[in-house]
Amino acid sequence: MALNVAPVRDTKWLTLEVCRQYQRGTCSRSDEECKFAHPPKSCQVENGRVIACFDSLKGRCSRENCKYLHPPTHLKTQLEINGRNNLIQQKTAAAMLAQQMQFMFPGTPLHPVPTFPVGPTIGTNAAISFAPYLAPVTPGVGLVPTEVLPTTPVIVPGSPPVTVPGSTATQKLLRTDKLEVCREFQRGNCARGETDCRFAHPADSTMIDTNDNTVTVCMDYIKGRCMREKCKYFHPPAHLQAKIKAAQHQANQAAVAAQAAAAAATVMTQSTAKALKRPLEATVDLAFPPGALHPLPKRQALEKSNGASTVFNPSVLHYQQALTSAQLQQHTAFIPTVPMMHSATSATVSAATTPATSVPFAATATANQIILK
């Protein structure tokens, strides 16, 4: 079985971090000296990063105002190294995926995967660098299409147990104590003032979180009790304070609503479970279809003092006969029945106490036993 996976164009290895000092207009290094990118205004900057022009690396970009960065020589060398490592990583992942697909079909021979020299930008996956056979492939950007990769872990000989994460990552919880920094302010060309812009204008760049370009708000300052001389948190103006308070109020209301919904769901579940429960007084009637058994009539008052009518009560016999007939309908086994008298007299009771020798067939049974011996 042959599996051909086409390489996917990945822009991650073309991404460069933008110099924050250059964005503020205070970088003393030139474009050829700074280790970060100095993009012109025509380039598209997202989250403090810029994508380099692939055609510029090949020397064939003919755009007048290219929205991608044309890197200088030292950054171009770094991007070329990243590109070679990314190509090796793509080939390795494609070969491993092909062999894992072959392993899923029995009878297909398992060939070792050739190893490649791994650069520092590929990652820290030890299975790629030394494993002579397969290792679990984790879906990643720029390796192979995510719809081709299996969504469940594939068990392969010689590979450590690894759980493949899902395609949808968990979303980060909204933080009410953070504000996004104005990018125009970082570039030094924000036309709005600090009291008019909806984004933060921090005076100190050290309080900016470089991961998401946000600042943490000083909650003590909002409550009017910050006594620090040099606070490391951002002190927002009045309009941003109102925005933070509104966000906190909305988050509290959402939490209360979620708790109320959870409590209502719990009560509903308990009431439904109680309604579905069977009563504890289980009777014999549950084992038979409706109408199979007649209700047991009330017992008649005793007329005789010897208690014979209590033993041979016709109503009790009627109920027992109905119960026996219902059992015969459900089971195919033959159950012999003994005829019972509907009433009993004193003579009958006295006859029951007669010794076994008075019975006609008793002597015959004894004689048969003697012959068998």
Curated annotation (Swiss-Prot):
Pfam families: zf-CCCH, zf-CCCH_10. Its main location: nucleus. It comes from the Eukaryota. One of its GO terms (molecular function) is zinc ion binding. Induction: Exhibits night/day variations with a 9-fold increased expression at night in the pineal gland (at protein level). A light pulse of 1 hour is sufficient to decrease mRNA levels. Up-regulation is due to a large degree to the release of norepinephrine from nerve terminals in the pineal gland and cAMP signaling pathway. Keywords: Cytoplasm, Metal-binding, mRNA processing, mRNA splicing, Nucleus, Repeat, RNA-binding, Zinc, Zinc-finger. Disulfide bonds: none annotated. InterPro entries: Znf-CCCH_Muscleblind-like, Znf_CCCH. Expressed in the cerebellum, pineal gland and skeletal muscle. In the pineal gland, expressed in pinealocytes, not in perivascular spaces (at protein level). SMART domains: ZnF_C3H1. A zinc finger (C3H1-type) spans 13-41, 47-73, 176-204, 212-238. It is found in: Nucleus; Cytoplasm. GO terms for biological process: mRNA processing; regulation of alternative mRNA splicing, via spliceosome; regulation of RNA splicing; RNA splicing. GO terms for cellular component: cytoplasm; nucleoplasm. Interacts with ITGA3. Mediates pre-mRNA alternative splicing regulation. Acts either as activator or repressor of splicing on specific pre-mRNA targets. Inhibits cardiac troponin-T (TNNT2) pre-mRNA exon inclusion but induces insulin receptor (IR) pre-mRNA exon inclusion in muscle. Antagonizes the alternative splicing activity pattern of CELF proteins. RNA-binding protein that binds to 5'ACACCC-3' core sequence, termed zipcode, within the 3'UTR of ITGA3. Binds to CUG triplet repeat expansion in myotonic dystrophy muscle cells by sequestering the target RNAs. Belongs to the muscleblind family. This is Muscleblind-like protein 2. The gene is Mbnl2.
